[in-house]
UniProtKB/Swiss-Prot annotation:
The gene is uvrC. This is UvrABC system protein C. The UvrABC repair system catalyzes the recognition and processing of DNA lesions. UvrC both incises the 5' and 3' sides of the lesion. The N-terminal half is responsible for the 3' incision and the C-terminal half is responsible for the 5' incision. The keyword Transferase does not apply. InterPro entries: GIY-YIG_endonuc (IPR000305), GIY-YIG_endonuc_sf (IPR035901), GIY-YIG_UvrC_Cho (IPR047296), Hlx-hairpin-Hlx_DNA-bd_motif (IPR003583), RuvA_2-like (IPR010994), UVR_dom (IPR001943), UVR_dom_sf (IPR036876), UvrABC_protein_C (IPR050066). GO terms for biological process: nucleotide-excision repair; SOS response. GO terms for cellular component: cytoplasm; excinuclease repair complex. Residues 16-94 form the GIY-YIG domain. It comes from the Bacteria.
């Protein structure tokens, strides 16, 4: 217990109502957030002589101050607790590392509806199907749907400006509603309805309707139409035969847990209309000494009560762990959803099979993660030995990417003792430098990254500079000029130059911009972790550069051409079938567009070519 914090005096002021408490250390940082049905009773338990665990002892020893927020109900306390955990990320709480919203398939409410992937708030008019475990699962499903039910997936801006069908129509992946006369309203509406039924799990209805249409087409001697529908029926059957489907039409999430060596894996199966849409493994950050019960309860609360997760609530949640606050959680989720949500821990039949599958996946993923962590730990230990450091708890790496000096992007990737910390990866758009000046770009990104206050835990032990002596010299110069409240001498600056022909294993490392560098054996674990973080940084920089370049490319050059306003721009895109068609057009073809003179056509042609 802290000598400064007077627990007895504090407890005299605490009410017995429900609420949330925040514990602070001497630096004013929130180190733990908790909730209680009875605040006085719960907080008193922290200051007994016989504490429940070493984790609690370590926590109490650091308490300098406690804030209490009283709530009307336990449900309010539960919601507020998880909002505070997300806000403060306290080091003694179990933390869900990835709280990105889940992707859905969106069927728009347009006259000719389109299919698309959607994340975030559901403001757009239309229908949402999901959630899916990740973007890959959505893209894979969209590609499949496009082959079976050819409704459009293009953006409205493209759809509204076409005067002739695109390649998707030519290869049979779209019915071409953008061009009048290619498909009837009735046919397009029918295909949209098939998509709606298919995504709702009503495959039998889709097949029944398609079979009826095929038989009618045969009776009407429309054999080509009958053959096309037959192919569609076969495609639907191929897809549905591969899926494990519960007869009950379950709409639920199944959560399996594995816990070993202080690490937890929570595996979630997403099941809608009896179909497994996919699954995902989570590895929450678990403070030392945390019991499995706290891991599960905190994870489930954060998973459903933080941010946009509450938008994806199923009708039922299956768990392989008996929660002490199961009723409170179910009531809170039901209140949020506006309907009854059941939390079940002892399922039977198909549900028991689902739970066994989730538990097996959690155990398998945990074994893999522990193996990877062991490898990362060995590599970081080897690198610390090479660099003569006691340990490496955090390492950051920088890289620059551009095309002939244009759309320059710098990346910063972060590794900790467990490997990549992707939530902390950052990209920086570089501006105000001579195009192609990588040294100036590195100088700018380092000043932006480190020229400000940094939390003690976020100060890297090693900063890896990709680019060799010149880039390392820039880093040294920046750090020499930094005037910051944290210890700027703590990070070790390390330059890495690519080997001959950029061949992996031939890298040269530099502590100083002058003099000779040194190399590590190709099979060195220390070199492997350097290659890993450098490659991550390189890929992250290139990804950002490509996005920026695509954005510039898509922000049509037409907008910068004098004499081409919104109406002419729309006419050009509509007449030529999009920007690509316009880029490929000759001066004579551009001049045929209504409202475009010969002189303006030449200006547009040369602007797009150069």
């Amino acid at each position: 217990m802290s000598e400064i914090f007077d627990a007895k005096a504090f407890l005299k002021t605490v009410t017995s109502q429900p609420g949330v408490y925040r514990m602070y250390d001497a630096g004013g940082t929130v180190i733990y957030v908790g909730k209680a049905k009875d605040l006085k009773k719960r907080l008193s338990s922290y200051f007994r002589s016989n504490l429940a665990s070493r984790k609690t002892e370590a926590l109490v020893a650091q308490i300098q101050h406690i804030d209490v927020t009283v709530t009307h109900t336990e449900t309010e306390a539960l919601l507020l607790e998880h909002n505070y955990i997300k806000l403060y990320q306290p080091r003694y709480n179990v933390l869900l590392r990835d709280d990105k919203s889940y992707p859905f398939i969106f069927l728009s409410g347009d006259t000719h509806p389109r299919l698309a992937m959607h994340r975030g708030a559901k403001h757009a008019k239309g229908e949402y199907f999901g959630p899916f475990p990740n973007g890959y699962a959505v893209r894979e499903t969209l590609a499949l749907l496009q082959k079976i039910f050819p409704i459009r997936q293009c953006e409205n801006s493209v759809y509204r400006n076409r005067s002739r069908p695109c390649l998707q129509y030519q290869i049979g992946r779209c019915l071409g509603p953008c061009v009048a006369g290619l498909v009837s309203e009735e046919e397009y509406t029918q295909q949209v309805e098939y998509v709606r039924l298919f995504l709702s799990g009503k495959d039998d209805q889709v097949l029944t309707q398609l079979i009826a249409r095929m038989e009618k087409a045969s009776q009407d001697l429309a054999f080509e139409e009958a053959a096309r529908i037959r192919d569609q029926i076969q495609a639907v059957r191929r897809v549905t035969e591969k899926q494990f489907v519960s007869n009950a039409g379950d709409d639920l999430d199944v959560i399996g847990v594995a816990f070993d060596a202080g690490m937890a894996c929570v595996h979630v199966l997403f099941i809608r209309q009896g179909k497994v849409l996919g699954s995902r493994s989570y590895f929450p950050k678990v403070p030392g000494g945390t019991e499995l019960g706290e891991v599960v309860e905190t994870f489930v609360g954060q998973f459903y009560l933080q941010g946009s997760q509450m938008r994806t609530l199923p009708g039922e949640i299956l768990l392989d762990f008996n929660l002490s606050d199961k009723t409170l959680l179910a009531d809170s989720l039901s209140e949020l959803a506006g309907r009854r949500i059941h939390v079940q821990t002892k399922p039977r039949g198909d549900r028991a099979r689902y739970l066994k599958l989730a538990r097996t996946n959690a155990a398998t993923a945990l074994v893999t993660k522990l193996s990877q962590q062991s490898t990362i730990t060995q590599r970081l230990t080897a690198l610390a030995t090479v660099l003569k450091l006691p340990a490496i708890k955090r390492m950051e790496c920088f890289d620059i990417s551009h095309t002939m000096g244009e759309q320059t992007v710098a990346s910063c990737v972060v590794f900790d003792a467990n490997g990549p910390l992707r939530a902390e990866y950052r990209r920086y758009n570089i501006a105000g430098i001579t195009p192609g000046d990588d040294y100036a770009a590195m100088n700018q990104v380092l000043r932006r990254r480190y020229g400000k206050a940094i939390e003690e835990s976020k100060i890297p032990d090693v900063i890896l500079i990709d680019g060799g002596k010149g880039q390392l010299a820039q880093a040294k110069a920046v750090f020499a000029e930094l005037d910051v409240p944290w210890d700027k001498h703590r990070p070790l600056l390390l330059g890495v130059a690519k080997g001959a022909d950029r061949k992996a294993g031939l890298e040269t490392l530099f502590f100083e911009p002058e003099g000779e560098g040194f190399s590590l054996p190709p099979d060195s674990p220390a070199l492997h972790v350097i290659q890993h973080i450098r490659d991550e940084s390189h890929d992250h920089a290139i990804g950002g550069h490509r996005k920026k370049r695509a954005k510039v490319k898509n922000t049509s050059t037409l907008e910068t051409i004098e004499g081409v306003g919104p109406k002419r721009r729309q006419m050009l895109l509509k007449y030529m079938g999009g920007l690509q068609g316009l880029r490929n057009a000759s001066v004579e073809e551009i001049a045929k567009v209504p409202g475009i003179s010969q002189g303006l056509a030449e200006k547009i042609f040369w602007s797009l070519k150069h």
